[in-house]
Amino acid sequence: MKKKNSKTKAAMTLAWGFVREAGLPLGEAMHRAYLNIALDARLKLGQSVEIAYRKADGTIREAIAVAARAGQDLVKGTGHGAPDRNYLYFDVGKNEFRCFCKARLLVVL
């Protein structure tokens, strides 16, 4: 019995969501899906990661991100997390929590 490649399946699922919701071409959507998977893997290891993403107004934000899970108990709110299409992180430079649409991720350094 062959072992299924879960990384490829996750990338395809994420990419098709980008195609449907953001109207990205499939090649660009696959590239951004693999960037999101790489970002998630590095943050789960506890590393700080330099990222860049396009904001809704078209400007590009560069940030040093760490996993938001570590400090989420400090956040008060409605109890509803960020939607699955958004990525929540803690911005070290601004010292606050931020989020961005996964389809807008440009670079993971």
PLM region spans:
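Short aromatic-glycine-enriched beta-strand elements
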Residues: 80-88
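Structured surface patches comprising rigid loops and adjacent beta-strands/short helices at the edges
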Residues: 72-73, 94-109
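A short beta-strand micro-motif
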Residues: 49-55
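Acidic, low-complexity, intrinsically disordered interaction modules
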Residues: 59, 64-74, 78-80
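Basic, alpha-helical nucleic-acid-binding regions used in initiation and control of genome expression
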Residues: 44-48
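Short, ordered coil/turn segments that flank beta-strands lining enzyme active or ligand-binding pockets
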Residues: 56, 93
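Amphipathic alpha-helical segments in structured regions that serve as interaction surfaces
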Residues: 2-22, 29-34
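SH3/SH3-like beta-barrel fold
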Residues: 51, 87-92
